[in-house]
Amino acid sequence: MSVIKHKAQRVGVFIDTQNLYHSAKNLYRSKVNFNNVLKDAVADRNLVRAIAYVVNTESGEEQGFFEALAKIGIETKTKDLQIFFGGAKKADWDVGMAIDAVKMAPKLDAVILATGDGDFVPAVEHLKTAGGCQVEVIAFGRSSSGRLKEVVDEFIDMDENPKRYTIGAVPAAKTRGAARGATRAKGTGDAWGTVKRLA
């Protein structure tokens, strides 16, 4: 679908960091180049706000990553990793990210979600109908929900240029499990490591 993009258009970018991180890790054994994700999401329009939803791990080694995001103009909202009896871990920002997008929609012309998670389909439908916003998604197509791709006004497939959207990309074996693993791994709480370079 063709979308309208112009310099005066007000955009908000909402980044599901866990989803992109695990997709890049499982598909390309690499890290995400958030600088290029942000540039291509904004596309020379008027950025109102960019927020990355992130998880604090037990080790705390993600602090350098948070600082790197701040340097390129991305705010972070953090949540502690929950560890349940038996060792199960959970770190899920889906509801918080969707609520922020809905709350900010009246101040935006376009909402850009950086995620491939199909849980956002109801939020996308609400933003388009009740919010009157153009809704775009930027994510790795191989690990993205087919339904999410269908309901958005534009889907930017990061798999079409993995070198642009990853740092240290090495294509993983093209198996059916690679794409499923990216989605399944979401929220497992693996350590982020530090981002050495975003540009």
Where are these regions (language model features)?
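Terminal and domain-boundary accessory regions
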Residues: 1-199
